[in-house]
Amino acid sequence: MGQVLPLVTRQGDRIAIVSGLRTPFARQATAFHGIPAVDLGKMVVGELLARTEIPAEVIEQLVFGQVVQMPEAPNIAREIVLGTGMNVHTDAYSVSRACATSFQAVANVAESLMAGTIRAGIAGGADSSSVLPIGVSKKLARVLVDVNKARTMSQRLKLFSRLRLRDLMPVPPAVAEYSTGLRMGDTAEQMAKTYGITREQQDALAHRSHQRAAQAWSEGKLKEEVMTAFIPPYKQPLVEDNNIRGNSSLADYAKLRPAFDRKHGTVTAANSTPLTDGAAAVILMTESRAKELGLVPLGYLRSYAFTAIDVWQDMLLGPAWSTPLALERAGLTMGDLTLIDMHEAFAAQTLANIQLLGSERFARDVLGRAHATGEVDESKFNVLGGSIAYGHPFAATGARMITQTLHELRRRGGGFGLVTACAAGGLGAAMVLEAE
């Protein structure tokens, strides 16, 4: 085993996660239609502070992220500070690491705590797939810049005359990798073919995710960590996630056609996570600061790791790469874990990562390690369902997973939990959490 890297301050304090909260997650263009990510972020941070009754001056830093950037609010973190009644002097900056954005926000706040520059901070993320930055074509954009500099009407008209009808069409945000042109679903199809993952296996995992999430809601396990959202025109509150299919049967999944490889594919809308709106945040403190304030932590951040691989083939292997590093830094093995929560971008991606975590060949030939990371115990894995069921507001998912895992660890009497995710650009993230 490699070097253990304890996450403690210079005074020996552990990094405590004292509270976490999220909005309900809503499918694109449903309950949060028209609500921008910055407002979702304000909503969850404001409610989190109200529930914990932590004085505004205690929070010294807010690190927040969004993946679908809005030009009018490029620093979402600072807008949240200014829009929630927090101390105006609170440091705030924004981060983006695709689907691992709130993992990065948590790591940044943890590093500030370890450096001693702060003693308490908030980390999180928000995204809206319903309020999108619809752009213009490159040709129209260039003409508009030139028109702004033109001195006469004739010069302006001459510039506009260069445009064709197709140049006036709106341009939606890109859904493909900038460097490869591949969509996430294309990569999921690659992984299904590379690792021999069948349509039936993918549908079974998706069905399991929805069944577990529906059960978690029906048993009241999520009520404490999901706020009620009141949205214009304030006629009906949103209380629960609206993507979960609690009454579906496995046979229903087989009816859908492939979404990406139309002829030979196995990835469908049902075994993939949907476009989603929502926000989530956690409060982190040094252990001693939490004690000063009389707060009982949900748990502690034991370790974290970020990795990056090539983007051309099977790039959503972040969990298989980052998990062994995070476990190594925590001084733990897979067998020591009480819970494992893996982001389900696609069922194919999830099953491929599970397969590789237990692969001796992958460990030896690809990671350069002597042994496999370890088999994933199904009884510990995504026990409350995952992103396929809950949805995936890109920047919020990590904070959801952290909060959800810590609450479940406490219900089980404590232990260690792994949260891990893949992300666009071949990125991966993993964190080990501890609850007492």
Curated annotation (Swiss-Prot):
A single Gene Ontology CC term: cytosol
Alphabetical keyword list: Acyltransferase, Cytoplasm, Fatty acid metabolism, Lipid degradation, Lipid metabolism, Transferase
Compartments it resides in: Cytoplasm
InterPro entries to which the protein is assigned, alphabetical: Ac-CoA_C-AcTrfase_FadI, Thiolase, Thiolase-like, Thiolase_acyl_enz_int_AS, Thiolase_AS, Thiolase_C, Thiolase_CS, Thiolase_N
Pfam families for this protein: Thiolase_C, Thiolase_N
Broad class of enzyme this protein falls into: transferase
UniProt EC number: 2.3.1.16
Main localisation: cytoplasm
Catalytic activity as recorded in UniProt: an acyl-CoA + acetyl-CoA = a 3-oxoacyl-CoA + CoA
GO BP of this protein: fatty acid beta-oxidation
Pathway: Lipid metabolism; fatty acid beta-oxidation
Active site: 99, 392, 422
One example GO MF annotation: acetyl-CoA C-acyltransferase activity
Keyword set includes Lipid metabolism: yes
Superkingdom of this protein's organism: Bacteria
Physiological role: Catalyzes the final step of fatty acid oxidation in which acetyl-CoA is released and the CoA ester of a fatty acid two carbons shorter is formed.
Protein family: Belongs to the thiolase-like superfamily. Thiolase family.
NCBIfam families referenced in this protein's UniProt entry, alphabetically: AcCoA-C-Actrans, FadI, PRK08963.1
Subunit structure as annotated in this protein's UniProt entry: Heterotetramer of two alpha chains (FadJ) and two beta chains (FadI).
PANTHER family: ACETYL-COA ACETYLTRANSFERASE, CYTOSOLIC, ACETYL-COA C-ACYLTRANSFERASE
Protein name: 3-ketoacyl-CoA thiolase
Organism: Escherichia coli O1:K1 / APEC
Gene that this polypeptide is encoded by: fadI
